[in-house]
Amino acid sequence: MRILVFLSTVVLAWFLTGAVASAGPVLEGDTDDPVSPAPAVSRPDSPHCSVTLAERFPSNAADGSPQTFSGTLTPPESCPGPWAKVVLDETVTVSGRQYDRIGDLLIGGTEVWWGTTAEPSGEGRRAITYHFDKDLTPYTALLRTPQPFTGGIGNYTSDVYTGVYAQTVTLTYYRADHAHPAPATADRVVGFRHADAAPGAATVHFTAKDLPRNIIRARLEVTLEGGACDEQWFDDVPDEVAARYPAANLCGHGPFREAAVALDGAPAGGVPTFPHIYSGGIVPTLWRPVVAIDTFSLHAETLDLTPFAGRLVDGGPHDLAFTVPDIGGSWSVVATLLLDTDHHAARTSGALTQDDAAPVAAKRTKVKDIAGGVNATVTAHRDDVTAGYVDTSAGRVRTRVERTRDYRNSDDVTVAGLTQHVVQSDAGWQSSVSTVDGKARSAVRHDWSYPLAVDASAANYVDDQNFRLTGAVDMTMRLSDLSGDGRSWWPVSASREWLGTSGVLARENGVTSESDGSSRTTYAGTDDRGRPYWHAITTDHGLVTAESGGSRRR
């Protein structure tokens, strides 16, 4: 349901008038600060130092124009490496009326954080403050030397949208010691500024150059964020359905999305994305105070490119291409290469021996009539295999990567296109097995599942002064990591984060008549140390009404 088409006008009108107290349906006032059930990044009990990149830095200058913070990040003298962990912390405060916005942090040309904001309620009586953190230890190689940085929230203000985001950003370096050893991390981090794909230009390219000549392992970390008609890509409909209901302004091209990756023109696999929903999405009251899963720091996927390592060590530039088939809006692509090198040889060599990765996923679409409308069902599948070898100081290392994805989206479109019921399943796994002389050297597997159900209705929409928008979302992120011997697997970590939420926003004759939401959310599994962790939160009318488990609210 392209509810956002209505909301661009609706929310503006709602904010201009504000909520008016009355008997009957609930009108939310000030809401609690945004919260999440997910565990915070763990912190070693070792000496540490913090570096401040921004201190209550406003997203906008005095004249209202967007601005970014910048400088040079230098490792603190009192906490030289090696480090057990490096953690990014960001605290954001905003009040007034504002849309959800996108933020990022570039260090040495690498996007180390990409996320979105909480949208303030618009009441203007109390600011909201939220905090998030991210483990930057995987980028340790980048952080060892002084690097330029720039970042911030891209925000735009007006006489109506007055909210300015105040940002405090720090990096904390935890020194390694006997009790907290430095973990193994990539020897080289090769990042790129993000690039945007769009209809008519569905492929973006990054050039990787000056790579090490002794690579033994290569991983590609990818974050994808949809915009415009693909902001809620999971409720995009096939073109024939959009054409059937032109007045509903439905977005077409169907709901399946991926970034098909190619290295120097050779297919390397497909990258999915979690169905992120931003804090103004569908109905804004859905996300107060519990925001959608991973709103503040978008989840990245990792594609193992080790079978291609023999090609990457030739000393020349290499093209990384990302294509978004059936693109209906814009897609921001954030890519980072994490490279391991041979510590006992200046040069390695190798070859790609098998490339059975499909250029695009196999997809099927079926549309049928149902009572009051149509059902559109889209399925897609990937079953990719790549393999190669690298000649190293430890011998010839052969690596086989298998990657699967099974996708299904069923969308009941009724009431002339103004109501949608979406049920989506999206799951897959990647395994990487490396052997020397037939014996397993390493074997890892990552499983993921992102089920989603969305009900959205603008059936009672008359105009921007008379409407009732309703929405309900049930979303889950299931992740698990396993290790093995090439034949059997055993669990290392697992988690399940779930959120069920419902919301409503209504106006009658230009006056807000209903503004309410409620939600339940849980996190169950392990934290980043592998320890059991459970946290549950219940909310109603924009306020936390119950909370159990966990170590702290954030």
Residue ranges of each PLM-predicted region?
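A short secondary-structure junction signal
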Residues: 200-205, 228-235
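Secretory targeting and sorting signals
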Residues: 1-23
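Functionally constrained cores in energy, signaling, and assembly domains
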Residues: 14, 90, 209
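Flexible, low-complexity coil/linker segments
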Residues: 150-218, 340, 344-393
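Short, compositionally biased leader-like segments
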Residues: 211-233
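Beta-strand-rich ligand-recognition modules
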Residues: 24-58, 62-79, 83, 91-185, ...
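Extended extracellular/luminal ectodomain segments enriched in beta-structured repeat modules
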Residues: 78-87, 211-219
